[in-house]
Design a protein with these regions (language model features):
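A short helix/loop element that forms part of the nucleotide-sugar donor recognition site in Leloir-type
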Residues: 195-211
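Aromatic "clamp/platform" in nucleotide-sugar-dependent glycosyltransferases that forms part
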Residues: 308
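N-terminal subdomain of nucleotide-sugar transferases
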Residues: 1-78, 107, 440-442
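C-terminal amphipathic helix plus adjacent low-complexity
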Residues: 2-22, 358, 362-368, 372-442
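Short hydrophobic beta-strand element within catalytic cores of glycosyltransferases
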Residues: 325-328, 338-339, 345-348
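Nucleotide-activated donor-binding/catalytic signature segment of Leloir-type glycosyltransferases, i.e.
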Residues: 264-287, 291
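Conserved donor-binding/catalytic core segment of Leloir-type glycosyltransferases
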Residues: 31-32, 211-228, 234-237, 253
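Carbohydrate-associated surface elements
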Residues: 168, 188
Length: 442
């Protein structure tokens, strides 16, 4: 079954989605909805990590509806190599009501897990009564900023359990919908991949990449989108090169992004317009596997994220895991990465302005902007910092990630959480702790 571009339910080559293997299996079956879990997006990657942890526990099977992109091939994929059963069904968008109900009726999953921005799931929450009468709904959620989004209250209350990605999100959910079970489950990085490389490995890479040789490298790994502040980054970096004490022949801004993203600015035009010299800015435009991304963090001296809104920010967490310090805007989930409240693992820049913006779906939310002056000061401080101190910042950040965002703890949290959801809420004949009516005093 797939949902085509017109969101019409279609039989895929006459295939019956009922799977006898799952019916006979006594494992807990989870239906997931998210970005395709084999895509390199943040949502896709984290969902893959969740799924892998569940499967490796030996207690779960997983059926995934993989969306977010226009697929060239809608053939279901059975993923081998795990103790449990895992099958992925490509869908347009994130599916639709008819599709989800069909999977629930035919595959009989015990839990529905879903993840991404809430604006993509209004259709799902509109049918929560038909879903939750049979199985619990678990939402993996992040919200960028305050004020408390009271307009999300009805969505939060349409879930049995919410897992919050950041401390900001955890506080928001507990305040807006205190009766909903909530757990703080932050993102994680795989330290087997994102780790500190040896000097020999780094030297080998640098020897074949001339632009980075004998230069201080600022790394920016972000989507080229408005909230990421691409234009401000480039213009202000140009100003940084002209500061007294900066040797522009010994500094490089390394940008891993799509310079032609329709949601962003024309990066190459900006670079040409501002007259950057060769080697001052280097672009990396190809999608790279995780092990190669890990090496990029290692050849960098510092990683930057100055987004005006950032629910979490995986790139800076990956950077810290590799031992590379960060410069970030003190907003959203970036705040808990750069400091634990006592020690710092880079430089945090306090927003200079907090505008309340919004849209028809999101009536209000803070947009945190840093100032040019504060950004230049942060770049200069990192650039002029004693190398041993900068290395120590990175090592402290690495320890921070290992203690608070470890891959092992992330997996255990999800196995324990989904096991407790199954025990406490049940499914079908054992469904409990759910009422589809609410009585309020007028």
């Amino acid at each position: 079954l797939i949902a085509n571009s017109d969101q019409v339910l279609v039989n895929f080559t006459g295939q019956n989605i009922v799977n006898e293997e799952l019916i006979l299996d006594k494992k807990i079956t989870v239906l997931t909805i998210s970005d395709h879990p084999l895509l390199p997006s943040g949502v896709g990657t984290q969902t893959k990590y969740v799924i892998e942890a569940l499967l490796r526990s030996g207690k779960f099977n997983v059926i995934s509806l993989g969306g977010a992109v226009k697929h060239q091939d809608y053939t279901p994929q059975k993923i081998d190599g795990y103790p449990g059963f895992w099958e992925i069904f490509p869908v347009d968008g994130y599916g639709n009501a008819q599709l989800v109900n069909a999977f629930i009726n035919d595959r009989k999953p015990d839990i529905l897990y879903f993840m991404t921005d809430p604006r993509f799931y209004e259709w799902l929450w509109s049918i929560d009564d038909t879903i939750r009468k049979n199985i619990p709904m678990v939402y993996y959620h992040v919200w960028d900023n305050y004020p408390y989004p009271k307009f999300n209250k009805r969505y939060y209350e349409s879930n049995d359990v919410i897992a919050s990605i950041s401390k900001v999100t955890s506080d928001i959910v507990r305040t807006v919908a205190p009766q909903v079970e909530e757990h703080y489950v932050p993102h994680a990085v795989d330290s087997n991949i994102f780790n500190e490389k040896t000097p020999e490995q780094i030297k080998k890479v640098l020897s074949s990449n001339k632009p980075f040789q004998d230069r201080f490298v600022f790394f920016w790994n972000n989507r080229n989108a408005r909230r990421k502040q691409t234009g401000s980054l480039i213009h202000w970096y140009k100003d940084f090169l002209e500061l007294e004490g900066v040797d522009r022949d010994k500094v490089c801004l390394f940008m891993h992004t799509d310079p032609n993203d329709p949601h962003g600015q024309p990066v190459q035009y900006l670079l040409d317009h501002l007259g950057f010299k060769e080697g001052e800015v280097v672009l990396s435009t190809s999608k790279l596997p995780a092990d190669q991304m890990s090496m990029l963090y290692n050849i960098a001296d510092c990683t930057i994220n100055i987004s005006d809104a950032e629910g979490f920010g995986l790139a800076t967490l990956e950077s810290l895991s590799c031992g590379t310090p960060i410069i970030v805007n003190m907003t959203g989930g970036l705040q808990e990465q750069v400091t634990d409240g006592e020690q710092w693992f880079g430089i945090g820049i306090q927003p200079a302005s907090k505008a309340i913006i919004g849209s028809q779906q999101v009536p209000y939310i803070y947009e945190d902007r840093i100032s040019r002056e504060d950004f230049l000061n942060a770049l200069l401080e990192m650039y002029q910092m004693d190398p041993d101190k900068r290395i120590e910042l990175g090592k402290l950040g690495q320890k921070h990630v290992q203690e608070n965002y470890s891959f092992e703890n992330f997996g255990k949290q999800w196995v324990d959480l989904m096991s407790s959801v199954y025990e406490n809420y049940g499914s079908y004949e054992t469904r409990k702790n759910y009422k589809n009516i609410k009585v309020e005093e007028l």
